A protein has these predicted regions:
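A generic short-segment signal for beta-strand/edge and adjacent turn/coil regions
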Residues: 103-111, 121-125, 133-138, 158-162, ...
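Bacterial Sec-dependent N-terminal signal peptides
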Residues: 1-29, 681, 705-706, 711-718
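Flexible coil/linker segments and helix-coil junctions enriched in charged and small residues
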Residues: 310-311, 318-320
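Generic low-polarity alpha-helical segments
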Residues: 1-2, 7, 21, 25, ...
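Exposed, low-structure sequence patches enriched in small/polar residues
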Residues: 250-301, 305, 311, 327, ...
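Membrane-proximal, glycine/serine-rich, low-complexity loop/turn segments characteristic
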Residues: 25-265, 272-301, 305, 311-312, ...
Length: 718
């Protein structure tokens, strides 16, 4: 075990202080945070890797760590790609992301308004805690064209005696950029300790997260200066922000314009069981050597052929306060154990008290020290001739209290009939906000929360969640309900309704550059309503669904990157179809999305989106090796995508760059031997189809030319 302890120390200290040139495939992230949506679900085969984990907000829902197969996203290690609908970035790996398909973002109280790096970050509620008998490690590494285009991810967990478990979740993205003055380095580190009392009446979770981004900006390609000569290599293509030579946190970029964003949080959460059945464990029974805390009195998700994130679960549960829809596969070895004899026990009512205290320290800084070359780029935002600077910092002390009750039997199992759970809570957030040059502000958020789970039969589940804000954000609220009906051989039907009212973010209301006020607004609150329905037929690889979004008082950034509020109602209907075909070893997976924005000039969206994977998968070399050879194609229809203003980290409207049908084509080969997986792939094959054109997804920010990327993943128990 000594090498694994060394690995933990290396990841912990290197992730925070090291210069790092590493990158890898991110491990399964939590389903309790984020703003991804109804297409984040993927059809995969069940697996047999006997490791399960859970998240602190939902400790009774065990999820199988079942991704040792060659899934359809293993060869796509970038966080913006992989499962579900892909997001678009600035061409460079690790850069700010925006949606291609509209999804509402969960809002709860005060929001600073900086979300361009959310897809790379790990919130404390998304740290997985593992139920294991042996130490567990999952390490993955991928590299692109150079040693400064790398990704590293590490999942590690081990037990310290029968009551304590430790978990580490680490992701590092490092890319020096292929065009001039580019750089991107993102780090997400989460570590946690779980203590379980032998009586089962107390569980405590200590977590620490460190998320950071360092970005060098070139403003995009100067298309007016591109010639046949200077476009032969990415490094000679002219860019809008030439800047001056400077070291960039060990990455070595030439960027004078840079962004630094750091979020750190330390938290302690604990559950008290006040009334209810204790764990049914013989006192004299010796636990297996190396065994850690037993799993909490768990709800075993019902069998299904889908794993990962549910299609309607994500947007409902981004707050981490409600339980996920139980559609995860339980594929561990316990499925082979004969079921125990049924014992009639009296039903009992369990009462749980939850408390969490956390402290977060977040700061964001942009600076450009070379305005002599960049003055034309910033226009009205260049308020000072010596340089530009934007700095904002928030420190948040948060306390969460919840009390809940659930009906259980005497053995600690959730009741299989007429089972239900009711929970009410209170959240207080004390926020200290620093923004140059105004004095420090103190804000208070107080939220009343509640959620109710009702399952009259094992085939029907209803989940509801609500919160209401008091004090500074008084009047903000969120209501949501999720219904799931398991129709057996006829499939699964899901429906969702959501409504929320929320105040503008801080950046939308007020912004300073180099201590000069650029804008100050008094926007009305935004009102959103979402209705969704999905029908799945897993045995045929079919899923059909739709969503309807209604947005009032929508806030956007106009063509000069100024915040504005729409006086008209925006409607966004969406229909999607996912259909997977297979014939022997030949597979074809398809996703189609149709969406329509009633105000394309305010909320531009591509009307059509498609994602296709054609591949051959089977065992070779006397069935010892599993191999997958395939091609991935992603495309969207013609539209005006939002541009990016790195000065304050927001995407904004533009009217000059319209991008039509330009598919992104990748060819990949993946192999697996036992628990070791590897891949090699070629990216941007369409460069050969259009050798004289740049590939843009975000205006002026081109994707790299043709390149080869390889990766390796190894997971083991020891």
């Amino acid at each position: 075990m000594r090498p694994l302890v060394h690995l933990y120390l290396f990841v912990f200290f290197f992730g925070i202080f090291g210069p790092g040139t590493l990158w890898a495939q991110a491990p399964p992230r939590g389903t309790t945070t984020g703003d991804s949506g109804f297409l984040e679900q993927i059809f995969v085969e069940p697996d047999t890797f006997d490791v399960s984990y859970f998240y602190v907000p939902n400790p009774k829902v065990l999820i199988s760590y079942d991704d040792t197969l060659l899934s359809n996203h293993f060869h796509q290690p970038q966080p913006s790609r992989g499962q579900g609908i892909e997001r678009i970035n600035l061409g460079n790996v690790g850069t700010p992301q925006q949606q291609l398909v509209f999804e509402p973002v969960f809002r709860r109280g005060y929001d600073i308004g900086l979300h361009q790096f959310d897809g790379y970050y790990l919130p404390s509620d998304s740290i997985p805690f593992y139920v294991i008998d042996k130490a567990f490690t999952d390490a993955a590494f991928a590299q692109g064209r150079t040693q400064q285009d790398q990704i590293l991810s590490v999942d590690f967990s081990r037990n310290f005696g029968p009551q304590v478990n430790m978990s580490i979740d680490f992701l590092r993205i490092n890319h020096a950029g292929v065009y001039k003055n580019q750089a991107a380095k993102n780090t997400a580190l989460g570590t946690g300790f779980w203590y379980h009392h032998p009586s089962g009446t107390y569980d405590g979770y200590f977590t620490f997260t460190h998320n950071s981004s360092f970005q060098g900006h070139n403003g995009g390609i100067d298309t007016s200066s591109v010639t046949t000569t200077n476009r032969s290599e990415e490094g000679t293509v002219p860019v809008l922000l030439e800047g001056t030579k400077m070291a960039f946190r060990g990455v070595g970029a030439d960027a004078a314009a840079e962004t630094r964003y750091q979020k750190q949080e330390v938290a302690y959460a604990h559950y008290f069981r006040l009334v209810g059945p204790r764990e049914n464990q013989p006192r004299r029974r010796k636990r297996k050597k190396g065994a850690g805390p037993p799993p909490p009195s768990t709800e075993v998700p019902p069998p299904d052929t889908l794993t990962g994130v549910d299609s309607l679960e994500v947007t409902a549960l981004t707050d981490g306060t409600t339980e996920v829809l139980d559609t995860m596969v339980r594929t561990d070895s316990s499925a082979q154990i004969p079921p125990p004899q049924k014992v009639r026990r009296p039903w009992k009512r369990e009462f749980l008290v939850f408390h969490k205290i956390s402290y977060a320290n977040n700061w964001y800084k942009f600076s450009d020290i070379s305005l002599a070359a960049d003055s034309a780029y910033y226009g009205r935002y260049q308020v000072h001739n010596q340089g530009l600077r934007h700095y904002i910092r928030e420190r948040v002390l948060e306390n969460t209290f919840r009390i809940g009750t659930a009906r259980q039997d005497g053995g600690g199992r959730t009741a299989s009939k007429n089972r239900g759970k009711l929970e009410v809570g209170l959240i207080h957030r004390l926020i200290r906000l620093e923004q140059e040059p105004v004095p420090t502000q103190t804000l208070n958020n107080l939220l009343l929360t509640g959620n109710w789970k009702f399952a009259p039969t094992p085939q029907i589940q209803l989940l509801t969640y609500a919160h209401y804000s008091l004090l500074q954000n008084i009047g903000d609220y969120h209501l949501s309900g999720d219904l799931q009906i398991d129709l057996g051989q006829l499939g699964v039907f899901e429906a969702r309704a959501q409504q929320q009212l929320y105040a503008p973010s801080h950046i939308q209301n007020r912004f300073y550059v180099t201590e000069s006020l650029v804008w100050e607004r008094d926007f009305r609150k935004t009102f959103e309503t979402t209705l969704a329905a999905t029908y799945r037929l897993p045995q045929f690889g079919t899923e059909v669904g739709g969503q309807y979004h209604l947005i009032n008082n929508y806030i956007y950034f106009d063509t000069i990157a100024q915040p504005q509020q729409s006086a008209t109602v925006i409607n966004v209907p969406q229909i999607y179809i996912r259909q997977n075909f297979s014939l022997g070893v030949l597979h074809l997976d398809n996703t189609f999305v149709w969406q329509f924005s009633s105000q394309q000039d305010l909320l531009p969206l591509p009307t059509l989106y498609g994602k296709h994977q054609l591949y051959i998968r089977g065992r070779i070399f006397r069935k010892v090796m599993l191999a997958r050879l395939g091609i991935d194609v992603q495309w969207n229809s013609n539209y005006l995508p939002n541009a990016y203003q790195h000065l304050f980290g927001q995407f904004h409207l533009q009217e000059t760059e319209r991008y039509g049908f330009q598919p992104i084509i990748d060819l990949s080969l993946s192999i697996k031997v036992k628990t070791v997986r590897a891949f090699v792939k070629t990216e941007n094959l369409n460069q050969f189809l259009r050798p004289n054109d740049f590939i843009f997804q975000t205006p002026l920010h081109a994707r790299p030319y043709f390149l080869i990327r390889f990766g390796l993943s190894w997971r083991f128990l020891n």
